[in-house]
Amino acid sequence: MRCVPVFVILLLLIASTPSVDATQKTKDDMSLASFHDNAKRILQTLRNTRSCCPEEPCCFWR
C-alpha cells in the first residue's frame, strides 16, 4: 500500500508533461524523450516490485 502514492504521483507527473516541445532547444536542454524513457523505466520498476511490497526484504523503499 505504500507503493500506491508513489505510483500515483509519477502518473500525475507524466500526465502533466507537454506532448509538444514549443521552445527551442539549446545544447544544455534534456530531450523530452529522455524524460519519458526515465519515467517509463521507473514505472516498470514499480510495477515489477508492487507484488512483493508486503514482504519486508523485497520492498526497497520502506
Swiss-Prot record:
Highest taxon in the source lineage: Eukaryota
Signal peptide extent: 1-22
Keywords: Disulfide bond, Secreted, Signal, Toxin
Keyword hit for Signal: yes
Tissues expressing the protein: Expressed by the venom duct.
Subcellular location: Secreted
A Pfam short name: Chi-conotoxin
InterPro entries from the UniProt entry: T-conotoxin
GO molecular function: toxin activity
Prosegment residue ranges: 23-50
Post-translational modification: Contains 2 disulfide bonds that can be either 'C1-C3, C2-C4' or 'C1-C4, C2-C3', since these disulfide connectivities have been observed for conotoxins with cysteine framework V (for examples, see AC P0DQQ7 and AC P81755).
Main location: secreted
GO cellular component, one term: extracellular region
Keyword Secreted carried by entry: yes
Similarity comment text for this entry: Belongs to the conotoxin T superfamily.
Notes on the domains: The cysteine framework is V (CC-CC).
Protein's UniProt name: Conotoxin Pu5.3
Organism field: Conus pulicarius
Biological classification of the source: Eukaryota, Metazoa, Spiralia, Lophotrochozoa, Mollusca
